[in-house]
Amino acid sequence: MYNLARQLLFKLSPETSHDLSLDLIGAGGRLGLNGLLSKSPAKLPVSVMGLEFPNPVGLAAGLDKNGAAIDGFAQLGFGFVEIGTVTPRAQPGNPKPRIFRLPNAEAIINRMGFNNLGVDNLVSRVEAAKYRGVLGINIGKNFDTPVERAVDDYLICLDKVYAHASYVTVNVSSPNTPGLRSLQFGDSLKQLLQALSLRQQELTQRHGRRVPLAIKIAPDMTDEETVLVAAALIESGMDAVIATNTTLSRQGVEGLPHADQAGGLSGAPVREKSTHIVKVLAGELAGRLPIIAAGGITEGRHAAEKIAAGASLVQIYSGFIYKGPALIRESVDAIAAMPRAAR
């Protein structure tokens, strides 16, 4: 059924298709129909960050930026759902067109630019949702906030989403907000992590529960840079790392239509880069911090490869666009088939 739906949706522009799909998934969730459209994955419970996940396959941030279809995505069988990226104030993002499909490579290029309706709108939607599973909320900075003031934006968002999130992801790796990726390095990263850790402690006291913080990083780092990031995460007491966001590289899509468009590349071509980052992180973190792997999962075996590389959880986005809900169950099954010692 999804193959037919995809053929129809792919006749529309990528952003129109995205918006329509989100509307349909949201409507299906409100009516309780989405569970009928896909076979639920087997139970494969896992405990990560002190949270209990029914299975280790989640929805990556970016597909549902405003929390418009939380219940709908949950009914498709995801073990957890991450929404956002959300910013303190609503913003339109970059000019259209800003999403480009590369179907021959099972890839997508986007330069959305954190288009969203603002954190207050997202919180109201989370409050209205029926979903009571693991919900991640991904936070970022507004386009017009200077990088040197970025910490303020992250703290504003953290304050507002804390009571509503199972965990919070700090996005410092989107390539579509100027200067954002500089926050992954050196003193900028240390200052951000320190501020977040202090605020997390304050909010834990205020709300009576500790909400884990995850940092989402880019795949375009050297091994040396990745090692330094790992050290900073351990030192600051962060709870998890998500590896990875989209890449600026065009390796694997050279010469394809739209390959020269600006933006972050996701999907199959980023798989090896992302998995390499997971391996480097796993070697450096040595189990002290869980890894959530994202990037290039278009088949179940790719999810298993991420777990084998050292991840505790995986997330899908572009693969979901190309393969539909069946990829969730396929990924859970592939992970379940791994020897227990390997997962």
UniProtKB/Swiss-Prot annotation:
Entry's Gene Ontology BP terms: 'de novo' pyrimidine nucleobase biosynthetic process; 'de novo' UMP biosynthetic process
Cofactor: FMN
Amino acids binding FMN: A61, G62, L63, D64, K65, T85, N138, N171, K216, T244, G267, G296, Y317, S318
The keyword Oxidoreductase belongs to this UniProt entry's keyword annotation: yes
Residue positions binding substrate: K65, N110, R111, M112, G113, F114, N171, N176, N245, T246
Keywords of this entry: Cell membrane, Flavoprotein, FMN, Membrane, Oxidoreductase, Pyrimidine biosynthesis
Domain of life: Bacteria
EC number(s) reported in the record: 1.3.5.2
SUPFAM superfamilies: FMN-linked oxidoreductases
Pathway listed: Pyrimidine metabolism; UMP biosynthesis via de novo pathway; orotate from (S)-dihydroorotate (quinone route): step 1/1
Keyword Amino-acid biosynthesis (UniProt): no
Annotated signal sequence range: none
Family annotation (InterPro entries): Aldolase_TIM (IPR013785), DHO_dehydrogenase (IPR050074), Dihydroorotate_DH_1_2 (IPR012135), Dihydroorotate_DH_2 (IPR005719), Dihydroorotate_DH_cat (IPR005720), Dihydroorotate_DH_CS (IPR001295)
GO molecular function annotations of the record: dihydroorotate dehydrogenase (quinone) activity
Catalytic activity: (S)-dihydroorotate + a quinone = orotate + a quinol
Cofactor comment text: Binds 1 FMN per subunit.
A Pfam family hit: DHO_dh
Recorded family membership: Belongs to the dihydroorotate dehydrogenase family. Type 2 subfamily.
Job description of the protein: Catalyzes the conversion of dihydroorotate to orotate with quinone as electron acceptor.
Assembly and binders: Monomer.
Protein name: Dihydroorotate dehydrogenase (quinone)
Protein species of origin: Pseudomonas syringae pv. syringae (strain B728a)
Classification of source organism: Bacteria, Pseudomonadati, Pseudomonadota, Gammaproteobacteria, Pseudomonadales
